Amino acid sequence: MIRIPRRPLLALPALAAGRALAQPPGWTVATEYPATAIPGEGVAHFAAGASAGGLPVTALPDGPAGYRSAAAFEALAAGRFAAVDAFAGALGGVDPLFLLSSLPFLTASPADAARLRDLARPGYAAAAARQGAVLLWTTPWPPSGFWTREPVTTPAALRGLRIRTYDSTGTAVLRAAGAAAEALSFAEVETRLEAGTLDAVLSSGDGGAGRRLWRWLPHFTEASYAWPLSLAFAAAPRLAALPPAGRAAVLAAAAETEARQWQAIEGRLAANRQVMRENGVGLHAPDPALRGLLREAARSAVEAWRAGAGEAGRAILAAYAG
């Protein structure tokens, strides 16, 4: 059982981060993922909880109005949404700390991911505050693997594969391993698959099932590449503009959503495998040579992250390793 930490209410960043907005009649919370993926379930749970607490909130899955995780803070600052869910790795250009949870082969279980989350949470909150946002909750993803047109279990099968990755680290790792990798928003994947310009997708069974990737990619290699996070944020001015009861409803719903998301991950892997089998997906394991190739390629990527993340990032990795 993963321990869900009890945490104090987050202090609100100063309103100097942006002009305080007029109190809205209700909030919207967006994610680029489908309603059936675990982040989509999270925004729905949050919306229901906050609404029950007296603040009307509408959940908007599937990338409403072109929303993408990489533009999370811009969307909040522009007032497009009051809150958003974002895949953490997509925010690596804002702060390298957001790449931490998707570093390859760093975590091997939900418990590992939770421990790394606890160590990194203050840094995530501080990075969000610098962007005029408040960290609301975290969502774990099941482990990442390769959705492919043909089985990919050997280095030869990976070589030249046109594969979507979800962040700059994944792109570097898979290129070093011989693939033709590029980082794409998950919302762009279907169009590229339909056009035939993509052979494979780095994602979890959860994300792939949400988009029914088996329509194009009927094989999944269980590489256990990473157990990454999505993070949810609110615009600090929107949160500060609420009356005390409204702020309490948001923060209580966020805490309940965090607990729900980390409890849900426990059975998610088995449930995803069942759905994949029911839809004819072939499940494969990488052979020892491919595992070795990926781990070797990952070492330099992790070292590059360590060098770019500064003392704070290195301290988190050291504490995690200890």
Residue ranges and their predicted role:
Residues I2-I4, L10-L15, L21-P110, A128-G322:
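N-terminal secretory/targeting leader peptides
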Residues A111-R121:
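A gly/proline- and charged-residue-enriched helix-loop-helix capping module
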